[in-house]
Protein backbone atom coordinates (compact mmCIF):
# COMPACT_ATOMS: atom_id res chain seq x y z
CA UNK A 1 0.00 0.00 0.00
CA UNK A 2 1.37 3.40 -1.00
CA UNK A 3 -0.57 6.55 -0.19
CA UNK A 4 0.30 8.16 -3.53
CA UNK A 5 -0.11 5.14 -5.82
CA UNK A 6 -2.86 2.79 -6.94
CA UNK A 7 -2.87 -0.28 -4.64
CA UNK A 8 -1.14 -3.19 -6.33
CA UNK A 9 0.57 -6.46 -5.44
CA UNK A 10 4.35 -6.74 -5.41
CA UNK A 11 5.95 -10.11 -6.17
CA UNK A 12 7.49 -11.44 -2.96
CA UNK A 13 9.48 -14.52 -4.04
CA UNK A 14 10.90 -16.21 -7.13
CA UNK A 15 11.61 -19.82 -6.07
CA UNK A 16 9.57 -22.70 -4.68
CA UNK A 17 11.81 -22.79 -1.61
CA UNK A 18 11.11 -19.13 -0.92
CA UNK A 19 7.39 -19.80 -1.28
CA UNK A 20 7.56 -22.66 1.23
CA UNK A 21 9.41 -20.48 3.74
CA UNK A 22 7.32 -17.36 3.19
CA UNK A 23 5.42 -16.16 6.25
CA UNK A 24 2.13 -14.42 5.59
CA UNK A 25 2.09 -10.98 7.24
CA UNK A 26 -0.30 -10.16 10.05
CA UNK A 27 -3.47 -9.32 8.17
CA UNK A 28 -4.27 -6.18 10.12
CA UNK A 29 -1.10 -4.64 8.64
CA UNK A 30 -2.33 -5.30 5.08
CA UNK A 31 -5.06 -3.93 2.83
CA UNK A 32 -7.48 -6.32 4.55
CA UNK A 33 -6.72 -4.52 7.81
CA UNK A 34 -7.27 -1.13 6.22
CA UNK A 35 -10.73 -2.27 5.10
CA UNK A 36 -11.76 -2.46 8.75
CA UNK A 37 -10.66 1.16 9.28
CA UNK A 38 -12.52 2.25 6.14
CA UNK A 39 -15.62 0.33 7.18
CA UNK A 40 -15.88 2.20 10.47
CA UNK A 41 -15.15 5.54 8.76
CA UNK A 42 -17.81 4.92 6.11
CA UNK A 43 -20.36 3.87 8.74
CA UNK A 44 -19.91 7.26 10.40
CA UNK A 45 -19.99 9.05 7.05
CA UNK A 46 -23.31 7.59 5.88
CA UNK A 47 -25.07 8.60 9.09
CA UNK A 48 -25.11 12.15 7.73
CA UNK A 49 -25.72 11.20 4.10
CA UNK A 50 -29.09 11.35 2.41
CA UNK A 51 -29.65 9.66 -0.95
CA UNK A 52 -32.96 9.99 -2.80
CA UNK A 53 -34.33 8.30 -5.90
CA UNK A 54 -37.36 10.00 -7.47
CA UNK A 55 -37.74 11.91 -4.25
CA UNK A 56 -37.81 8.81 -2.08
CA UNK A 57 -35.02 8.30 0.42
CA UNK A 58 -33.15 5.03 -0.06
CA UNK A 59 -30.86 3.35 2.46
CA UNK A 60 -27.08 3.41 2.07
CA UNK A 61 -25.60 0.17 3.37
CA UNK A 62 -21.92 -0.20 4.24
CA UNK A 63 -20.65 -3.76 4.01
CA UNK A 64 -17.43 -5.46 5.08
CA UNK A 65 -16.22 -8.53 3.21
CA UNK A 66 -13.14 -9.76 1.34
CA UNK A 67 -15.19 -9.94 -1.89
CA UNK A 68 -13.83 -10.66 -5.36
CA UNK A 69 -10.67 -12.46 -4.26
CA UNK A 70 -9.39 -15.99 -3.70
CA UNK A 71 -6.33 -17.82 -2.39
CA UNK A 72 -5.34 -18.68 -5.98
CA UNK A 73 -5.40 -15.01 -6.95
CA UNK A 74 -3.29 -14.12 -3.91
CA UNK A 75 -0.78 -16.87 -4.70
CA UNK A 76 -0.31 -15.57 -8.25
CA UNK A 77 0.08 -12.03 -6.95
CA UNK A 78 2.76 -13.15 -4.50
CA UNK A 79 4.64 -15.50 -6.84
CA UNK A 80 3.96 -13.89 -10.20
CA UNK A 81 3.70 -16.02 -13.33
CA UNK A 82 6.09 -18.54 -11.75
CA UNK A 83 3.16 -20.01 -9.85
CA UNK A 84 1.68 -21.45 -13.04
CA UNK A 85 4.80 -23.51 -13.80
CA UNK A 86 5.12 -24.53 -10.16
CA UNK A 87 1.67 -26.15 -10.39
CA UNK A 88 3.40 -28.72 -12.61
CA UNK A 89 6.86 -28.74 -11.03
CA UNK A 90 5.91 -28.64 -7.34
CA UNK A 91 2.19 -29.40 -6.98
CA UNK A 92 2.37 -30.43 -3.31
CA UNK A 93 4.13 -27.19 -2.34
CA UNK A 94 1.52 -25.19 -4.26
CA UNK A 95 -1.34 -27.00 -2.56
CA UNK A 96 0.19 -26.38 0.86
CA UNK A 97 0.69 -22.69 0.10
CA UNK A 98 -2.87 -22.30 -1.17
CA UNK A 99 -4.14 -23.97 1.98
CA UNK A 100 -2.21 -21.53 4.16
CA UNK A 101 -3.72 -18.57 2.31
CA UNK A 102 -7.17 -20.16 2.58
CA UNK A 103 -6.74 -20.46 6.36
CA UNK A 104 -5.97 -16.74 6.50
CA UNK A 105 -8.95 -15.99 4.24
CA UNK A 106 -11.22 -17.84 6.69
CA UNK A 107 -9.72 -15.97 9.64
CA UNK A 108 -10.23 -12.56 8.03
CA UNK A 109 -13.71 -13.15 6.59
CA UNK A 110 -14.89 -14.60 9.91
CA UNK A 111 -13.65 -11.50 11.73
CA UNK A 112 -15.24 -9.22 9.13
CA UNK A 113 -18.61 -10.86 9.71
CA UNK A 114 -18.24 -10.62 13.47
CA UNK A 115 -17.45 -6.89 13.21
CA UNK A 116 -20.28 -6.14 10.79
CA UNK A 117 -22.81 -8.46 12.42
CA UNK A 118 -23.29 -10.43 9.22
CA UNK A 119 -24.28 -14.11 9.55
CA UNK A 120 -21.56 -16.59 8.67
CA UNK A 121 -23.64 -18.27 5.96
CA UNK A 122 -25.06 -15.20 4.26
CA UNK A 123 -23.47 -15.62 0.83
CA UNK A 124 -20.01 -15.30 -0.68
CA UNK A 125 -18.81 -13.24 -3.63
CA UNK A 126 -15.76 -15.20 -4.80
CA UNK A 127 -13.34 -14.70 -7.68
CA UNK A 128 -10.73 -16.88 -9.37
CA UNK A 129 -9.57 -14.26 -11.86
CA UNK A 130 -6.05 -15.69 -12.21
CA UNK A 131 -7.31 -19.18 -12.97
CA UNK A 132 -8.81 -18.80 -16.45
CA UNK A 133 -5.49 -19.76 -18.05
CA UNK A 134 -5.22 -23.16 -16.34
CA UNK A 135 -6.95 -26.31 -17.55
CA UNK A 136 -10.15 -27.79 -16.17
CA UNK A 137 -8.11 -30.63 -14.68
CA UNK A 138 -5.77 -28.22 -12.88
CA UNK A 139 -8.67 -26.08 -11.73
CA UNK A 140 -10.33 -29.10 -10.16
CA UNK A 141 -7.07 -30.11 -8.53
CA UNK A 142 -5.90 -26.78 -7.12
CA UNK A 143 -8.88 -24.42 -6.95
CA UNK A 144 -12.04 -26.45 -6.42
CA UNK A 145 -11.17 -27.92 -2.98
CA UNK A 146 -10.44 -24.48 -1.54
CA UNK A 147 -13.36 -22.71 -3.21
CA UNK A 148 -15.75 -25.45 -2.07
CA UNK A 149 -14.50 -25.08 1.51
CA UNK A 150 -15.10 -21.32 1.47
CA UNK A 151 -18.48 -21.53 -0.26
CA UNK A 152 -19.64 -24.14 2.23
CA UNK A 153 -18.47 -21.98 5.13
CA UNK A 154 -19.78 -18.59 3.97
CA UNK A 155 -22.19 -19.25 1.08
CA UNK A 156 -25.90 -20.01 1.03
CA UNK A 157 -28.63 -21.24 -1.33
CA UNK A 158 -29.90 -17.78 -2.28
CA UNK A 159 -29.53 -16.74 -5.95
CA UNK A 160 -26.48 -14.68 -4.96
CA UNK A 161 -25.33 -17.08 -2.25
CA UNK A 162 -22.45 -18.68 -4.20
CA UNK A 163 -21.32 -15.95 -6.57
CA UNK A 164 -18.31 -16.29 -8.88
CA UNK A 165 -16.52 -13.53 -10.76
CA UNK A 166 -14.34 -14.87 -13.56
CA UNK A 167 -13.51 -12.38 -16.30
CA UNK A 168 -11.74 -13.46 -19.45
CA UNK A 169 -12.40 -16.73 -21.26
CA UNK A 170 -13.80 -19.22 -18.77
CA UNK A 171 -16.02 -21.59 -20.81
CA UNK A 172 -13.67 -24.54 -20.23
CA UNK A 173 -14.18 -24.19 -16.46
CA UNK A 174 -17.98 -24.26 -16.55
CA UNK A 175 -18.27 -27.99 -15.65
CA UNK A 176 -16.37 -27.36 -12.41
CA UNK A 177 -18.28 -24.18 -11.61
CA UNK A 178 -21.63 -25.92 -12.03
CA UNK A 179 -21.07 -29.49 -10.90
CA UNK A 180 -18.23 -29.15 -8.36
CA UNK A 181 -18.80 -25.72 -6.83
CA UNK A 182 -22.56 -25.41 -7.40
CA UNK A 183 -22.29 -21.68 -8.05
CA UNK A 184 -25.55 -19.75 -8.18
CA UNK A 185 -24.36 -16.68 -10.12
CA UNK A 186 -21.54 -15.93 -12.58
CA UNK A 187 -20.86 -12.24 -13.10
CA UNK A 188 -18.41 -9.92 -14.81
CA UNK A 189 -17.52 -12.23 -17.69
CA UNK A 190 -17.20 -10.56 -21.07
CA UNK A 191 -17.12 -11.05 -24.81
CA UNK A 192 -14.39 -13.70 -24.67
CA UNK A 193 -17.27 -16.09 -24.00
CA UNK A 194 -19.79 -16.20 -26.85
CA UNK A 195 -23.49 -16.35 -25.86
CA UNK A 196 -23.95 -19.73 -27.56
CA UNK A 197 -21.10 -21.15 -25.43
CA UNK A 198 -22.95 -20.52 -22.17
CA UNK A 199 -25.40 -23.40 -22.71
CA UNK A 200 -24.13 -25.51 -19.79
CA UNK A 201 -24.90 -22.77 -17.27
CA UNK A 202 -27.95 -21.30 -19.02
CA UNK A 203 -31.12 -21.80 -17.01
CA UNK A 204 -29.21 -23.16 -14.01
CA UNK A 205 -27.10 -20.17 -12.95
CA UNK A 206 -27.78 -16.43 -12.99
CA UNK A 207 -25.55 -15.04 -15.77
CA UNK A 208 -24.51 -11.41 -15.55
CA UNK A 209 -22.11 -10.45 -18.32
CA UNK A 210 -20.44 -7.18 -19.19
CA UNK A 211 -20.15 -4.66 -22.00
CA UNK A 212 -17.73 -5.62 -24.76
CA UNK A 213 -14.76 -3.24 -24.35
CA UNK A 214 -14.54 -2.94 -28.14
CA UNK A 215 -18.05 -1.48 -28.13
CA UNK A 216 -16.88 1.22 -25.76
CA UNK A 217 -13.73 1.75 -27.80
CA UNK A 218 -15.65 2.20 -31.04
Descriptions of predicted regions:
Residues 1-22:
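A contiguous, low-structure linker/loop signature
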Residues 4, 25-218:
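Active-site loop segments of alpha/beta catalytic cores
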Amino acid sequence: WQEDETPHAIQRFTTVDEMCRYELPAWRSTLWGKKVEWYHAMKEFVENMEVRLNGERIPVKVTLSINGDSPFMSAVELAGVNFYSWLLEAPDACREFLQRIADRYVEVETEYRRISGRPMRDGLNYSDDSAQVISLKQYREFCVPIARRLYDMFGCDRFDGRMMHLCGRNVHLHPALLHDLNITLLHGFGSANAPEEMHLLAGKVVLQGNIDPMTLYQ
